[in-house]
Amino acid sequence: MLLHLPLAELEVGHHLYWQIGNLNIHGQVFLSSWIVIGALLAVVVLGTRKMERDPRGVQNLLEFLWDYLRDLARDQIGEKVYRDWLPFIGTLFLFIFVSNWGGALIPWRIVHLPSGELGAPTADINTTVAMALLVSLAFFYAGLSNKGLKFFEYYVEPTPIMLPFKIIEEFTKPLSLSFRLFGNILADELAVAVLASLVPLLVPLPVMLLGLFTSAIQALIFATLAAFYIGEAVHEEAH
């Protein structure tokens, strides 16, 4: 008997399914995710292979990204504990950024698979929901690890009347994070795929450039909100 998850039934197009035990997983998401992870690892190896005191090329790019993400995490989480969460925020940003740019630049859907369509990882609702749930888990872990059971006072501040609203908020956070990212990236990817198949190469370029811009913005929004939620959990006072 197969285990069916409601979110896993939400799909656009056809999927390449891999069966592992009682689970059907989207194989094309794993394939494209491995491509993204491989690209990130290749850039990191290339940029750190011969470190120089005066950074140039890829090393300079990596140091710029490090400084930018460090400042983002410090501003949203706070000076006290931001270092603990910088790897998490940085990983989210880089994975989403490269996935989004891949969806904007590469017409994944014209790549033929035995079944299904290849697509950017962030164009699959299961990927974005999984990352949003990770952010929610990080929120609770950050709060409990820093404040203990006093963390739950957050739900009745400034007045106990806020309790039901804050409980509802915990459900809307992952929903808004996941569907915002999924919808924007899927729309960009579909636009690039359709135009690339219907018109010459130069015509889709404006759409691709717009897709690159919105893809970068979506990665930044996701990472910033993730850092903000974690900061909200660890701060003695709300933002």
Swiss-Prot record:
It is found in: Cellular thylakoid membrane. HAMAP family: ATP_synth_a_bact (MF_01393). Key component of the proton channel; it plays a direct role in the translocation of protons across the membrane. Keywords: ATP synthesis, CF(0), Hydrogen ion transport, Ion transport, Membrane, Thylakoid, Transmembrane, Transmembrane helix, Transport. This is ATP synthase subunit a. Disulfide bonds: none annotated. The chain crosses the membrane at residues 27-47, 86-106, 125-145, 190-210, 211-231. InterPro entries: ATP_syn_F0_a_bact/chloroplast, ATP_synth_F0_asu, ATP_synth_F0_asu_AS, F0_ATP_A_sf. Signal peptide: none annotated. It holds the Pfam family ATP-synt_A. GO terms for cellular component: plasma membrane-derived thylakoid membrane; proton-transporting ATP synthase complex.
